[in-house]
């Protein structure tokens, strides 16, 4: 039900327009990556509790969950930092500033009221917390921004369980503030994700939402807005189902790694025999034009991919002008990213 574009979606649109322009040129090209996400990035995580429900997970634990190398708390396979460092081959170093708990102005029930338009009370709560941070002299200057001054990542962790059904109140979601929240020196906040903390912390959803905000990654599952459900690329990407273990989500798929600039080696296929390793970001590419191509990687059921449905070569068909709402499998209407299935039965679609 949340329809307004976020800042990361706007960044993707700019990239897609550039790809469409490139497609008008004659000839076959290696598809150029979108804006790369490499180097040091720093995001923000605001901890929120309520007058009638205090936070039970200490700030120090959340800091370790976000940043500590080799973190094992609650059975997680590393920290958020570890996840992005590993899947990027060390090319993205993403750390997070975690605030002290902010106590909301009203009881939890006010913000979870299912009768209020979805997102409204979440935005109210986040803006309360931001105003408190700003008035207290918080230093926003160290947070990473895009070229228009928008801070990439604003995470809100709130105390306790999620008391709502899907599409209500504080049900976990990512969206954008009604208007940019100015914090000085041309910096502003707009995109956010909000999640309940529960009794323990888990990597999967947090990493997925930061994949949106930091890397401008799209969802590779089907929103079913056309009332036809499909499975996108299934468990073969963080930005789709991401595996069956919330504490050890699967890797980002080859398409998005390539777009983010995380490839170690890209080989354009023409003819001959080629070898590709499973423990590196090495990809084969067979391009049709700058926005449509096959990209191939070797995936193995171990480490971050331990819950994959299978091992071997994963062949993705990419049409960067497509959509994962397009489950018709026609020549004119493609998925943005589809996993080719050996039996040809289109089970994922």
Where are these regions (language model features)?
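Primarily auto-inhibitory N-terminal propeptides
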Residues: 1-63
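Soluble non-cytosolic domains of exported or imported proteins
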Residues: 56, 119-124, 200-201, 205
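Short, polar loop/linker segments at the starts of domains and inter-domain junctions
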Residues: 56-69, 250-254, 326-337
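Active-site-proximal segments of metallohydrolase catalytic domains
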Residues: 26-35, 78-185
């Amino acid at each position: 039900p949340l329809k307004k574009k976020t800042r990361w979606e706007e960044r993707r649109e700019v990239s897609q327009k550039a790809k469409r322009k490139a497609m008008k040129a004659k000839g076959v090209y290696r598809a150029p990556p979108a804006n790369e996400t490499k180097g040091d990035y720093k995001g923000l995580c605001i901890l929120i509790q309520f007058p009638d429900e205090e936070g039970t997970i200490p700030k120090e634990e959340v800091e370790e969950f976000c940043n500590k190398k080799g973190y094992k708390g609650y059975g997680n396979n590393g920290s958020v930092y570890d996840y992005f460092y590993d899947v990027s081959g060390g090319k993205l170093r993403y750390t997070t500033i975690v605030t002290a708990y902010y106590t909301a102005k009203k009881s939890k029930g006010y913000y979870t009221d299912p009768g209020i338009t979805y997102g409204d009370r979440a935005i109210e709560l986040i803006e309360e917390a931001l105003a408190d941070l700003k008035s207290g002299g918080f230093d926003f200057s160290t947070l990473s921004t895009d070229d228009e001054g928008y801070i990439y990542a604003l995470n809100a962790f709130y105390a306790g369980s999620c008391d709502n059904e899907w599409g209500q109140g504080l049900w976990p979601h990512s969206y954008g503030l009604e208007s940019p929240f100015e914090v000085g020196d041309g910096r502003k906040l707009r995109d956010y994700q909000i999640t309940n903390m529960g009794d323990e912390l888990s990597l999967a959803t947090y990493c997925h939402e930061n994949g949106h905000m930091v890397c401008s990654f799209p969802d590779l599952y089907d929103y079913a807005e056309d009332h036809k459900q499909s499975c996108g690329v299934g468990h073969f990407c963080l930005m789709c189902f991401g595996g069956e273990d919330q504490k050890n989500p699967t890797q980002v798929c080859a398409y998005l790694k390539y777009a983010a600039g995380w490839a170690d080696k890209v080989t354009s296929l023409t003819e001959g025999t080629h070898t590709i390793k499973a423990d590196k970001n090495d990809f084969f590419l067979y391009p049709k034009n700058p926005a449509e191509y096959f990209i191939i990687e070797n995936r193995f059921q171990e480490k971050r991919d331990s819950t994959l449905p299978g091992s071997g070569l994963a062949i993705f068909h990419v049409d960067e002008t497509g959509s994962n709402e397009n489950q018709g499998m026609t020549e004119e209407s493609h998925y943005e990213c589809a996993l080719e299935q050996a039996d040809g039965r289109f089970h994922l679609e």
